[in-house]
A protein has these predicted regions:
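Structured soluble/peripheral alpha/beta segments that form catalytic or ligand/cofactor-binding pockets
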Residues: 1-189
């Protein structure tokens, strides 16, 4: 249950979403995420997530990529040794390529920066939120899947959610939009 403005709300049987933080301080310097349905085959989907991680002086990037094919097979790539995924991400383009177990998957997501929400993220040690994520809820995504060099599936979805996170990046986008200092989010332009 929750209480807001003196009103009591019950949520018995409701579906909920919980965000997993990336560590004690909440989020890495940069991260990316995306998912899409709405392909021509209704049971297909694509999801990915990645980020820059570090422990002391060690730094690396990791990305996981999961694709459900029209025939129901699910492909999971992202093990840095046997099925690595490379990601080149900007605020309006997500380009991923993964290989492993004979599979090759290419994903390209696109969404105009001005149509993104700027969302807050928590800074636990400071007990406050900060602008942190550039979130597109109406992007597009293309996927190409091959196995041992043979085409398996390719499609396009006009229904992709795409995110590029980073505190400095999100603050810069708020300033570009003319949002006052201290605000932690903004609607699309």
């Amino acid at each position: 249950w929750a209480e807001l403005d003196g009103r009591h709300w019950e949520f018995d049987g409701a579906d909920v979403y919980g965000e997993k933080n990336w560590g004690a301080e909440g989020f890495p310097d940069s991260w990316w995420w995306g998912q899409a349905q709405g392909f021509s085959e209704p049971d297909t989907c694509v999801a990915f997530a990645g980020g820059q991680i570090h422990s002391g002086p060690l730094r690396t990037e990791v990305t996981a990529l999961v694709v459900r094919l029209p025939d129901g097979r699910v492909i999971r790539l992202g093990n840095p040794v046997v099925s690595p995924v490379r990601a080149r991400v900007a605020d309006d383009v997500w380009a991923l390529e993964g290989r492993g177990y004979g599979w090759r998957i290419r994903v390209t997501g696109r969404a105009p920066l001005g149509r993104a929400h700027v969302l807050p993220v928590p800074l636990p040690s400071e007990k406050r939120n900060s602008a942190g994520a550039i979130e597109h809820l109406s992007g597009e995504l293309e996927v190409e899947v091959s196995r041992f060099g043979r085409h398996v599936w390719s499609d396009h979805s006009p229904q992709a959610a795409l995110e590029h996170g980073g505190l400095d990046r999100a603050e810069a986008e708020l300033r570009r939009r003319g949002v006052p200092v201290g605000e932690t989010g903004a609607a699309p332009e």
